[in-house]
Swiss-Prot record:
The lineage of its organism: Bacteria, Pseudomonadati, Pseudomonadota, Gammaproteobacteria, Enterobacterales. The keyword Ion transport applies. The gene is atpG. This is ATP synthase gamma chain. It comes from the Bacteria. It is found in: Cell inner membrane. It comes from Yersinia enterocolitica serotype O:8 / biotype 1B (strain NCTC 13174 / 8081). It is a peripheral membrane protein. Keywords: ATP synthesis, Cell inner membrane, Cell membrane, CF(1), Hydrogen ion transport, Ion transport, Membrane, Transport.
Amino acid sequence: MAGAKEIRSKIASVQNTQKITKAMEMVAASKMRKSQERMAASRPYAETMRSVIGHLALGNLEYKHPYLEERDVKRVGYLVVSTDRGLCGGLNINLFKKLLAEMKGWSEKGVECDLALIGSKAASFFGSVGGKIVAQVTGMGDNPSLSELIGPVKVMLQAYDEGRLDKLYIVNNKFINTMSQEPRIMQLLPLPPAEDGELKKKSWDYLYEPDPKALLDTLLRRYVESQVYQGVVENLASEQAARMVAMKAATDNGGSLIKELQLVYNKARQASITQELTEIVGGASAV
């Protein structure tokens, strides 16, 4: 059994770590609230944009934009959204596992995959496991802006425009609630039709001003940008929620460990006192 002094040192060490994890839990809770506000503010725009674009995909368009047309799939692209920091449980690795499984499925069909990475964890992971990385951006912090995301988005859209990509997806964690975040792979291009069954039964027609091509060229790019930005803010809210939960679990585990060490310390101290008393009694008997 370890000595009482050594056990006291371990208890102090765990208590110090517990203070750190508690502080990190409180910081993550504060950041999560701000991230949720940002996510809630942008979600209606992103969902409305997706709904309008879904109507367009079902519409009788006088100009058929390339983003609306299905192609034979030879190469697909993924915009992968991850965190810049760790200590957020299995948030990143669960997302990467889902993506790797999908990439394996494409590979078995002879389809190649390009990756545009957002966040240092994705850059680190796919840099080690392999994958064709065509763009990456890291270090966006807790308040990302659309201008920081334009680089990877532009690279993937250019590849799609030039026919080097036949499908484009965004990969991110969707924020469900504080305790639940869901890894998601969502198709961006070609434009998926609206999922609502009632909408599919309707025929949509639009009048465009000034002309369909100019409007659709701009609108469809804005659609992709809005979905990527929403994916990033959802992932950020998921990160802070996962970190808060992970740090709370670490703090609680620290408390349990301290109790166990306190028991061991008490037993060690009791054994030490018993030994001292035995030595005193033995010495008195010898006299």
